[in-house]
Amino acid sequence: MAFGKVSNWAVPLTALMYAMALVCLPMFAGGSRGLVYAADTDAENYGTVIGIDLGTTYSCVALMRNGKTEILANEQGNRITPSYVAFTDDERLIGDAAKNQVANNPKNTIFDIKRLIGLKYNDKTVQREIKHLPFEVVDKNGMPAVAVTVKGERKLFTPEEISGMVLGKMKQIAEEYLGKKVTHAVVTVPAYFNDAQRQATKDAGAIAGLNILRIVNEPTAAAIAYGLDKTEDEHRIVVYDLGGGTFDVSLLSIENGVFEVQATAGDTHLGGEDFDYKLVRHFLKVFKKKHGVDVSSNAKAMAKLKREAEKAKRALSSQMSTRVEIDSFVDGIDFSETLTRAKFEEMNLDLFKRTLKPVEKVLQDAGLKKEDIDDIVLVGGSTRIPKVQELLENFFNKKASKGINPDEAVAYGAAVQAGVLSGEEGVEDIVLLDVNPLTLGIEVTGGIMTPLIKRNTPIPTKKSQIFSTAVDNQKTVMIQVYEGERAMAKDNNHLGKFELSGIPPAPRGIPQIEVTFALDANGILKVSATDKGTGKSESVTITNEKGRLSKDDIERMVAEAENYQKEDEEIRAKVEARHKLENYAHSLKNQVNGDLGDKLEEDDKETLLEAANDVLEWLEDNSDSATKEEFNEKFESLSQTAYPITSKLYGAGASDATDDEDDESDDYFDHDEL
């Protein structure tokens, strides 16, 4: 870990000389700040690359031809297609046909699958979601799978397979429009999707027969749709993306065709479906109170109610009240209720207000005030809700921009990105700078997480740092990779680990091990470690099997990092003070026992050895219980013992040398240990 500056008088010159001999500076190989998405060299083999908005409730496909972006309609003439898959006795249905028969076939009609993709079965969010779903979700090797009856047989489908079917439908729509095969696509995901969810989305594309060239964050794609013609001075925009199942906020700057994401936040389990469920629960209570019948376990009745709740919600965006009527709802009883906009807003106000927290977060992360924002861009069908618009506009004291279709903006931006990758004319000058949502790092001695790629770093990026061994003759180091905002590694999410072995025997702190994190444009992480002495290297690519974070985990980490920031800083400072003392004591001991020991008088040699050994013995007994102040006191005491001896050895030049080489001394104590 990085130790603080060491005052001149506190560092013995022998240590400085020793540090000069091994010079192990923490090294950072700064990666590219962003990526110019120029036409790929293999673009001629791609054919037409399509852009797909794979939504929780609806999906949309678009493409670029002759410099123009086109949103494609399905066979029903609709420009958005329900993300529904159904299995009947005779066939598989996808899109409108699947959604239209859900009330008669609830157990074999699958929707909201995006809420499950890339997550583990025992994840809290998965368990919460399946309570609302009429179809069966089971545990398949620790991952969720949907159980349906297909032609009389029970079959299991993973979320990737179901999403693959929806992507396949989008591919089919494009192929029918073009009259030729489509093999490559750009697909969008929520900005707060973690690595596992992104990987799972790419897998879904492969299942659909699509090579996913790029995973793009939804609000970033929407910003492209909004800002394509903005070539004047820098424009700062907030993209507020409230869809059917996910919520994202991104703060971007647009200048001369350069789109830079400055901050992103969100909630991968908040959207229009949640507003629907509140209405459903309300109607269930009303019906039970009137008729004494609980229909919550009746799948067909619940499917009917959900369908009508969604219709009512949509109607209330343009009128003050609506009538919800279902003939023969259950047991021959009709359902008939009036719902006002005021009642709908009252029921969902807590959820509407919850969307403002990530808005505040992106402003805070970007170091900006509300007044610095030039435009608010609304994306996602749920932004049509008047109360949502009102809360957001009141927050910024500014009207939101309504110049783009909230249902189509994301697919539009994805198509532009696809056009860039396939070399379409008119988009050559677009530069897209996206960011990673969470800090990535490794565990070092003392359990501290050392960050290599900070939260909100533009991607793709590559960062490297030199580490060393913690004990003499250490032959193997374990690289433990974590994701999160807490100071201690154990409080963050463990992504994976690997060993680098075969390190030649050497004193602690001598081997140089370069750890490199490479985060690609899709947010996929590769970690490698190289022994600089031997050139031996090991690496791991963090994939969906490694268990990246769920939405709840992300929220918990960020919230806990804020709540416990003071506690984290205290723990970090204590561990750093302890390691500074331990390294100093070992350094003195090694030098006295080494070549420099021959130049010392026997009494001085004995004094230094005794002082160093006393500290090391004290550390063995008090390493966990001592305070930061006690470690610092021990460090000062040891320094005061050592300095007069080294000053005497090197005479008046010691002070000057110490001044000149202050940075070198810090480098010695700055080595993180694995």
Swiss-Prot record:
Location of the region described as Nucleotide-binding (NBD) in the Swiss-Prot/TrEMBL record: 143-297
Region (Substrate-binding (SBD)): 416-516
Activity regulation note: The chaperone activity is regulated by ATP-induced allosteric coupling of the nucleotide-binding (NBD) and substrate-binding (SBD) domains. In the ADP-bound and nucleotide-free (apo) states, the two domains have little interaction. In contrast, in the ATP-bound state the two domains are tightly coupled, which results in drastically accelerated kinetics in both binding and release of polypeptide substrates. J domain-containing co-chaperones stimulate the ATPase activity and are required for efficient substrate recognition.
Motif (Prevents secretion from ER): 671-674
This protein's record includes keyword ATP-binding: yes
Gene Ontology terms: biological process: chaperone cofactor-dependent protein refolding; endoplasmic reticulum unfolded protein response; ERAD pathway; fungal-type cell wall beta-glucan biosynthetic process; IRE1-mediated unfolded protein response; karyogamy involved in conjugation with cellular fusion; post-translational protein targeting to membrane, translocation; protein refolding
Catalytic activity, EC: 3.6.4.10
Segments of this protein annotated with the region Disordered: 651-674
N-terminal signal peptide: 1-34
InterPro entries the UniProt entry points to: ATPase_NBD, BIP_NBD, Heat_shock_70_CS, HSP70_C_sf, HSP70_peptide-bd_sf, Hsp_70_fam
Feature: compositional bias, Acidic residues: 657-674
One GO location term (cellular component): cortical endoplasmic reticulum lumen
Keywords: ATP-binding, Chaperone, Endoplasmic reticulum, Hydrolase, Nucleotide-binding, Signal, Stress response
Main location: endoplasmic reticulum
Compartments (UniProt record): Endoplasmic reticulum lumen
Keyword Chaperone carried by entry: yes
Binding site for ATP: 55-58, 114, 244-246, 310-317, 381-384
Catalytic activity, as annotated: ATP + H2O = ADP + phosphate + H(+)
Gene3D superfamilies per record: 1.20.1270.10, 3.30.30.30, 3.30.420.40, Actin, Chain A, domain 4 (3.90.640.10), Substrate Binding Domain Of DNAk, Chain A, domain 1 (2.60.34.10)
Example GO molecular function: protein-transporting ATPase activity
Family: Belongs to the heat shock protein 70 family.
NCBIfam families the record matches: PRK00290.1
Record function comment: Probably plays a role in facilitating the assembly of multimeric protein complexes inside the ER. Is required for secretory polypeptide translocation. May physically associate with SEC63 protein in the endoplasmic reticulum and this interaction may be regulated by ATP hydrolysis.
Name used for this protein in its record: Endoplasmic reticulum chaperone BiP
The organism's taxonomic lineage, starting at the top: Eukaryota, Fungi, Dikarya, Ascomycota, Saccharomycotina
